[in-house]
C-alpha cells in the first residue's frame, strides 16, 4: 500500500514539473524575442567620422622667419615687412640697400646663402640672376592681374612694383623745362645737369641700356651730356639731393617716386617724362633656389600681389604691379611715354653701358 502511495506521489510531482516547464518556455521565448526586437530597433551607436585628409595643395602652416633683401624706399620695405608679419606670424629679416649693394651682398654670401627673397630695382639684373640659375620658378597669387610683361615667361621674375625715370628739375633754378633727352646737351644747360650713378642705381642703369638699344643715337646722347658738364653725385638719393639744394638744376634719369615724395613734402621740384619716351622698370621680386625658408618665401611673394601690399606700393609713389590698381598721387603707367624695350638686349649691355657713362664723366 505504501509503495502504491509513493508511486502516486511521484507521478503527481512529474506532472506538476512538466506543467511548469510548459508555462516558462513561452515566457522565455517571449523575453528572448522582446530583447531581440529591442536590439534591432535601438539606433546603432554612431561611429565617429574619419577625418578627411588635408588637400594635397593646402598651404602649409607658416612659422619662423623669411629673409628679404629690398631696395629703397626704406619706408615701404618696413611697412611691407610689418604687414606680412601681422598677417602670417612670420618674422621678416631685412637687408635694405641699393641694387648694387644687394648684388654685392649676394655674391659675398654665395657659399652660405642667407636670403630667401630678393627684390631689385633693375629688371636686367634680375634677368642676369635667372641666367646664372639662381632663381626658383613659382606662380604667385593674383598673377593673372599683373601688368603685361611684368612676369617673365619662366615665372621667376615678378614685377612687384615699378618706377620710371624722368627729368627732375629745381623750379627755383629752372622755372620751366620740357627738353627731350638730346636737348639737355644744349649750351643753356651747361654744368647744370646731373645723373644718378648707374652702377649703384638699377633704374638709371636700365634706362641707359634702354637708351642705347632702343634709340638710334643713345651713345651719342650720353657723350653730349658728358661734354655739357654732366656730373654723377652718387646713387638716387644723393643725386636728387644735389638738385633739391640747388647745387645742380636738372637731374637726368631721376627715379620718379623720389621726386613725387619730395614734392609732396614741399620741395621746389618738378618732374616730367620726355616725349621721346623713357624706361618703365618693373622691380623684380625673386625667390632664390637656395632659400632656407622656401614656404615662407613663396608666401611673401604671394603677399606682394595682395590688395594690402599694392596699396602700400601706391602710397609710396611707385607704380603698382596690378593692372586693376591705379594711383592718385602720381602719373599712372598708361600716361608715361615709353621707349621700346628689348630686355634681353638691355641685359647684355647694361653693365658695360653704366661703366661707360661713369668713365665719360670723370
Label each PLM-derived region with a short phrase.
Residues 18-29, 38-40:
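Bacterial lipoprotein signal-peptidase II cleavage site
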Residues 166-173, 209-212, 281-293, 304, ...:
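A bilobed periplasmic-binding-protein/Venus flytrap-type ligand-binding module shared by bacterial periplasmic
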Residues 124-128, 249-268, 317:
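A ligand-binding cleft/hinge motif common to bilobed small-molecule-binding domains
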